[in-house]
């Protein structure tokens, strides 16, 4: 069993984390936490770099833009905040009418999508953020996760407590619904842009990233909160209700290893961009960085 680097600093459950793309300075981790203080860390060793100060409520999601120059956080204080990762300053704050659970950058970094307990998706232009470009209704319960298609900045995907993944065409306003058996807990695209990885209930599903046809569905013996596919597509990690981070063979679904250490359910997990490590965040308030993949 591998021994993780334990990244302390948060005082309440860690709700989300993301790795940046690699650049000349390496990679970084941004974490969201119910303590309201998102943190920036070195992606190689987990060392704390800084804390983004300004939220007045729990922070539910955290994302980098493609160059790692900015970070985006969504909060229970009814705001989405854009941060400068170099100096930690708040660039702008986008007001909402209720708790915001998710926010993500478009591929070209010019727009963001947000969603939360209002059950409404909003699209904002970061050059003119005072009013949304679009407001999209259709979800019947809280939106927990939303992201942009890696192949088309006019396509947005969202999922949440209504047990449906919705694929929205922003040009026409039409949607396609992919039904799940349980609430959608996480959603990410693979590094090579071939797969969409989603979790719901005890299932991890791998979809074709262009046709959105389900290619593989693996049922696991615990409720899954998160999953991430290795950059070479050989294996995936999953975490959830049993406190452990599991590693599975992508082709067969067979379990390769179990990583124990968290003292609460695993809320989020991601592979590093080079695949040499993965990070997990938990209800126990810690981030653990697992090396040597």
From Swiss-Prot:
Pfam families for the chain: eIF2A (PF08662), WD40 (PF00400)
GO terms for molecular function, please? RNA binding
Q: Keywords on this record?
A: mRNA processing, mRNA splicing, Repeat, WD repeat
In terms of superkingdom, the source organism counts as Eukaryota
Q: Where are the WD repeats?
A: 9-53, 54-93, 95-134, 138-178, 180-217, 219-258, 261-293
Gene Ontology BP annotations? negative regulation of transforming growth factor beta receptor signaling pathway; spliceosomal snRNP assembly
Gene Ontology cellular component list? SMN complex
Q: Which InterPro entries does the UniProt entry name for this protein? A: G-protein_beta_WD-40_rep (IPR020472), TIF_beta_prop-like (IPR013979), WD40/YVTN_repeat-like_dom_sf (IPR015943), WD40_repeat_CS (IPR019775), WD40_repeat_dom_sf (IPR036322), WD40_rpt (IPR001680)
- Is the keyword Ion transport in the record? no
On assembly, the entry states: Part of the core SMN complex.
Which protein family is it in? Answer: Belongs to the WD repeat STRAP family.
Q: What does this protein do?
A: The SMN complex catalyzes the assembly of small nuclear ribonucleoproteins (snRNPs), the building blocks of the spliceosome, and thereby plays an important role in the splicing of cellular pre-mRNAs. Most spliceosomal snRNPs contain a common set of Sm proteins SNRPB, SNRPD1, SNRPD2, SNRPD3, SNRPE, SNRPF and SNRPG that assemble in a heptameric protein ring on the Sm site of the small nuclear RNA to form the core snRNP (Sm core).
Q: What name is this protein filed under?
A: Serine-threonine kinase receptor-associated protein
Instruction: Please give the organism.
Output: Dictyostelium discoideum
Query: What's the name of its gene?
Result: strap
